[in-house]
Swiss-Prot record:
<keyword id="KW-0472">Membrane</keyword>
<keyword id="KW-0444">Lipid biosynthesis</keyword>
<keyword id="KW-0949">S-adenosyl-L-methionine</keyword>
<feature type="transmembrane region" description="Helical">
    <location>
        <begin position="249"/>
        <end position="269"/>
    </location>
</feature>
<dbReference type="GO" id="GO:0004608">
    <property type="term" value="F:phosphatidylethanolamine N-methyltransferase activity"/>
</dbReference>
<feature type="topological domain" description="Lumenal">
    <location>
        <begin position="102"/>
        <end position="166"/>
    </location>
</feature>
<protein>
    <recommendedName>
        <fullName>Phosphatidylethanolamine N-methyltransferase</fullName>
        <ecNumber>2.1.1.17</ecNumber>
    </recommendedName>
</protein>
<feature type="region of interest" description="Disordered">
    <location>
        <begin position="756"/>
        <end position="786"/>
    </location>
</feature>
<keyword id="KW-0812">Transmembrane</keyword>
<feature type="transmembrane region" description="Helical">
    <location>
        <begin position="272"/>
        <end position="292"/>
    </location>
</feature>
<feature type="transmembrane region" description="Helical">
    <location>
        <begin position="365"/>
        <end position="385"/>
    </location>
</feature>
<dbReference type="InterPro" id="IPR016219">
    <property type="entry name" value="Phosphatid-EA_MeTrfase_fun"/>
</dbReference>
<feature type="compositionally biased region" description="Low complexity">
    <location>
        <begin position="760"/>
        <end position="783"/>
    </location>
</feature>
<dbReference type="GO" id="GO:0032259">
    <property type="term" value="P:methylation"/>
</dbReference>
<keyword id="KW-0256">Endoplasmic reticulum</keyword>
<keyword id="KW-0489">Methyltransferase</keyword>
<keyword id="KW-0594">Phospholipid biosynthesis</keyword>
Length: 952
């Protein structure tokens, strides 16, 4: 990470050297000496407006006001007032700071604010309009960092981050203080609580608070102030993500286990109000993590790797490659060989987004779920029905663990599942697809039957305030949420291949990678993955549900020990990790005697497992007799159009601007001109799908520096005077540094270039007299000077769809339209089968594939923004990589293929094909399959239509 994020690299070396020293130091190196020297220097330095230990008096004063307010308010107002106070500070944290960080990550907004306001410019230069603010900030920051820091010489990114830290300190301190005061206001002792429960409640609560404190301190020890205050949102250092200490124990410890203290305080306060507001605050923090931090981490530290480029060694090899694509009956029916022998995941099963009712597995699951729901809702909750629902759940759990485990065990030792399909002439890919359907159906029915049984056994409490009814429901819901989160994390780490035990079916298994939740736990499904069944048992308080939970947990552990673990040891051997991050952290903290005890327990468990395996191996032939396998045969895409949101902002006074000086014209050097109409009186400008569009504009010399140009579809805006529909990011500023977003300047080539323009004798300054097309008046007089500029719209600033569009020039950051460009069209050319030589046989696709490649390559290059890093230069060169969450390039290609060839693919198909050659082969075969249903004639054999011309 040798560059700054979204801002230019500072020339100052002090920042880099200071961080480089910190990086070179060991993580656990003591720093007391350095801190002591800094403290001594700070003691000698005169401090104004700060306490002797360096804490801001303003922050302490606001905290003190909170405490005073607690004692001044009457008792009946304390709880609501401090609830509002805490929620306000929490909103300032999660919404306020979250918005600032989001804008800084994507647009460098805070750094742009600092540049625009010039608050860090030395007043001696005469360019700083706020000299007093400059002096105040300088005094504050130099007091905060007494050594190794120069306010004048530090990069603007670093100074901006330091000011941001002061705001964060205020919000975080007030957030925690208001929460503690709210807990004090709500604190009480239950009337029926005995002394033993009181002691237990306080001991556990204090333990959670101390654990929370240790997590925060250890996290700060590892990440230091740079990551603690989100420094990488402002600038980057040559350092990767750190996983040490508490970061080895749990994912995002400051947001997960780092909130244990909130629940400890709730326990000590013995208040459900504190508990519920703690859950709300914790949920808001997770939303902050998901919406702000995770996207920035993915963008900064987990960028996709550079693509592999194909280099042709010599012309002879290229000639052989071309000749190999000639039509032949033996080669054309076989797809290009995949460089990886693993199955391509193009039609996933797991998740609502992958639901496909055309697939028999999904439709069967939906029908069975409806049946379960109907039976559960329409039958009474009598003991006999409860018994049958619990029995049904137990049977499905046995099948899910024992039956599926038996199939996987046979597949691991003798490949029985794959052999069955090979026996009937099918491939191992077909066996894999059928297995995925069987496992997915079994898992769904197992949990559906469990939920139905829990519903039958559940009864609403008659009195929610009696006993622990509320607490049991809260804890139960928390355990269910924990299992859902664990399952999602496992799927994100393993993918479709690992979720369905792909290494049981394919020998070419990928190398083990311990990422995601597996960084901390070897088998998260052993405990966390079954937390939800215990949550249901806790909510229902039913002995039958406790039995089901115990059965589920026992069978789950047995499945891991008897099926998964032996196969993993056989497949990966010494590549398996012995201890996960959490276990390593716990072992490091254990005394030697406990470590010896742990080793003895491990040996006993290993010997017991070996004994059970020997018994099962002996009984397997008898158990296998008469056992048969069950076989089952195995999208809708929604195109979302942007909402028409009115966001009109109008400048009331346009006096002083010559409307005839405003013009906007589309550069026609890259467009295709087509005659429109029989008399050829007009021309239609047509641009290729995805090609960059250059725009030239002119404006008066006194035009606003906040003018901007937007791209709109014709018909979106009913008015030619005012734009009332959002551009959805498809706009470019006319001048640098005018808006709080670096994206607004993306595409800006030149601005405010003074040029000469012929004048008009009847110059009008009324908005209604403007020329929307930017054409000059016929009555010409002496020329005058105007400002001009050029910009290019490309990538995300284009409409990735066909249609007729226009550019609009807007005034002063508002939506007054000063000029409108000539309409132009974005079009995808239809692929004409008539271009293929007529001698191509019906069973040979060589020329067809080549023609499709030639037609498709420039479109695909446009879809990848013509970026040399990701855009293919040849049909054989692979596409660039993109993350799972951002499929914009694949979506563009899917739309282009659909419009060009009339064939609709999923985005996963484009990603799996990987290059234009494979995609062209797939299109060619899809056209052959769909030829009998096509509305156009085909060069191949098809049913005669009896018509003399093609249907349009």
């Amino acid at each position: 990470m040798a560059r700054l994020s979204g801002v230019e690299r500072p020339d100052d070396s002090g920042l880099r050297e200071r961080k480089a020293k910190a990086v070179e130091e060991p993580v656990k190196q003591p720093v007391e000496g350095a801190d002591g020297a800094a403290a001594a220097a700070q003691a000698k330095k005169k401090t104004i407006g700060r306490t002797p230990d360096g804490t801001d008096i303003l922050v302490l004063s606001i905290i003190g006001l909170h405490i005073v307010l607690l004692y001044l308010l009457p008792s009946f107002l304390r709880i609501p007032i401090f609830a509002v106070l805490f929620l306000s500070w929490r909103a300032a944290y999660n919404i306020g700071i979250g918005w600032l960080l989001h804008m800084q990550s994507n647009h460098s907004t805070m750094v742009l604010w600092a540049r625009q306001t010039k608050i860090f410019v030395n007043p001696a230069t005469g360019d700083n309009p706020h000299p007093q603010l400059y002096s105040f900030i300088k005094r504050e920051l130099e007091t905060k960092i007494p050594e190794d820091y120069s306010f004048e010489d530090a990069p603007i990114e670093y100074n901006t981050w330091l000011v941001f830290r002061r705001v964060v300190d205020l919000i975080l301190m007030c957030d925690f203080t208001s929460y503690c005061l709210f807990a004090i206001a709500c604190g009480s002792r239950p009337a029926e609580e005995n002394f033993l429960v009181l002691i237990l409640r306080w001991v556990v609560g204090l333990g959670l608070v101390l654990f929370n404190l240790w997590v925060k301190l250890d996290a700060h020890r590892v990440v230091k102030d740079f990551a603690w205050y989100w420094g990488d949102f402002f600038y980057l250092v040559d350092q990767e993500l750190t996983f040490d200490g508490v970061f080895e124990m749990a994912p995002h410890p400051m947001y997960s286990v780092g909130y244990a203290g909130y629940y400890g305080i709730s326990l000590m306060a013995a208040s459900y109000k504190v508990l519920f507001i703690s859950i709300l605050a914790h949920a808001a923090q997770f939303a902050f993590l998901v919406l702000v931090e995770n996207p920035h981490i993915e963008k900064t530290y987990n960028a996709p790797p550079p693509r592999k480029r194909t280099i042709e060694s010599h012309a002879g090899l290229a000639g052989e490659e071309k000749s190999s694509r000639r039509p032949s009956e033996s080669s054309e029916m076989v797809p290009p060989p995949s460089p990886v022998a693993l199955p391509s995941s193009t039609h996933n099963l797991v998740g609502v987004k992958n639901l496909d009712l055309h697939r028999i597995t999904d439709s069967s699951i939906i029908l069975i779920q409806v049946l379960f729901f109907a039976l559960t809702m329409l039958t009474p909750s009598t003991p006999i029905y409860q018994f049958f629902f619990v029995l049904n759940a137990a049977i499905w759990r046995l099948w899910y663990s024992v039956g599926i485990g038996y199939i996987l065990n046979c597949q691991s030792h003798r490949r029985e599942w794959t052999r069955h399909f090979v026996k009937f002439g099918e491939t191992k890919e077909e066996a894999w697809n059928q297995w995925k359907g069987t496992y997915h159906l079994s898992m769904t029915l197992c949990y559906a039957s469990f939920i139905a049984a829990a519903w039958k056994m559940y009864t609403l409490p008659e009195n929610w305030g009696y006993g622990l009814a509320i607490l049991k429901h809260v804890l139960g819901a928390g355990l269910i949420a924990l299992q859902i989160w664990t399952s999602v994390s496992i799927y994100d780490s393993l993918g479709e291949f690992g979720w369905f035990f792909g290494d049981f079916f394919f020998d070419e298994a990928p190398k083990l990678t311990y990422s995601g939740i597996y960084r901390f736990l070897n088998n998260p499904e052993r405990v966390l993955g079954l937390a939800g069944v215990w949550g249901a048992a806790l909510i229902t308080s039913s002995r039958a549900m406790i039995f089901l939970a115990l059965l589920s947990h026992t069978l789950g552990i047995a499945f891991i020990q008897l099926v998964e673990r032996p196969h993993m040891q056989k497949l990966y051997g010494r590549g398996l990790r012995q201890d996960a991050g959490l276990v390593r952290s716990i072992k490091r903290s254990l005394p030697p005697s406990f470590k010896q005890l742990h080793g003895s327990v491990d040996r006993i468990l290993d010997e017991s497992i070996e004994f059970i395996e020997e018994v099962l191996d002996t009984a397997r032939p008898k158990l296998a007799a008469g056992v048969t396998t069950f076989v089952k045969d195995t999208s809708e895409l929604f195109h979302k159009y942007p909402a028409r949101i009115t966001i009109t902002r109008i400048e009331p006074d346009l006096a002083g601007y010559d409307m005839n000086d405003y013009s906007i014209n589309v550069d026609t050097s890259d467009c295709i001109t087509i005659r429109d109409g029989a008399e050829d009186k007009s021309e239609v400008l047509v641009f290729e799908y995805g090609s960059p569009i250059k725009v030239n504009w002119t404006a008066p010399l006194n035009h606003s520096k906040r003018d901007w140009v937007g791209l709109y579809m014709i018909g979106q805006n009913p008015s030619r005077e005012v734009t009332n529909v959002s551009s959805w990011g498809r706009w470019v500023a006319t001048n640098h540094g005018s808006f709080d977003s670096v994206l607004s300047e993306k595409g800006l080539i030149a601005s405010d270039v003074v040029v000469s323009k012929p004048g008009t004798s009847n110059t009008s300054k009324k908005p209604s007299a403007k020329s929307s097309s930017g054409k000059k008046s016929s009555t010409s007089s002496s020329s005058h000077e105007v400002a001009s500029g050029q910009m290019v719209f490309s990538g995300d600033k284009l409409w990735w769809t066909q249609g007729v569009f226009e550019f609009r020039y807007h005034h002063n950051g508002k939506h007054n339209v000063m000029a409108t460009s000539r309409p132009f069209e974005i079009r995808i050319p239809k692929f004409d089968d008539g271009q293929i030589p007529s001698h191509v046989s019906s069973n040979g696709n060589g020329f067809m594939t080549t023609a499709i490649e030639q037609a498709l390559l420039p479109i695909v290059q446009n879809c990848f923004d013509r970026d040399p890093e990701i855009s293919p230069q040849t049909a054989e060169e692979p596409f660039g990589c993109e993350t799972e969450g951002d499929l914009k390039y694949a979506k563009r290609v899917v739309y282009a293929v659909h419009q060009m060839f009339g064939i609709e693919f999923a985005t996963e198909v484009v990603r799996a094909d990987g290059n234009v050659q494979n995609l062209a082969w797939r299109i060619c075969n899809a056209k052959k399959v769909l030829a009998p249903y096509s509305m156009r004639k085909s060069n191949g054999a098809s049913t005669p239509t009896g018509e003399s011309e093609e249907m349009k």
